[in-house]
Amino acid sequence: GAPSKFIVADMPFMSYHVSVEDSLRNAGRIMKETGVNAVKLEGGREFCAVVKALTAASIPVMGHLGLTPQSVHKLGGYSVQGREEDKRKRLVEDALMLQDAGAFSITLEKVPASLAKEISEKLTIPTIGIGAGNGCDGQVLVINDLLGLDSGFHPKFVKKYADLYSVSKEALETYNREVKDRSFPSKDYSYE
């Protein structure tokens, strides 16, 4: 575990979509079985009743607005959310509604920096940005992206702080070569 860290678990797809009762049961199970400190769910006003029920049951809830990966196909792909005025307005309203429902924080993903800043200034709870500019109260990146653990596509907002993919690939190739030529394990790594 990580006793000095605050850990938030994503509620899996469809674990909070069917009913408030199912959502309570599923969130409670996640909290008990994983030992996390809070749960996060994607979506706005349509899930405010769930947020209210969970927080009433002492389950801390983080909201998630903008690009919501669990419903990416409904959104038309991995595009920036909230560029059009009506969608921008709806995201602001959804953020305020989630706050009023009891969310302790909201993740804003892949929205214009100006929108994230506007939402952050209107809320009294912290915002965490991922592809939302520097106007949020905090930032998050996927650890595999941050560490450069793969060589594939990376969204514009991802900054690779290391290239562990290349380091790992080189280490595995060296290991493979040494096993094949029998230079590993040498005496230093063997028992007599």
Regions found by a protein language model. Name each.
Residues 1-162, 166-192:
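Alpha/beta enzyme core
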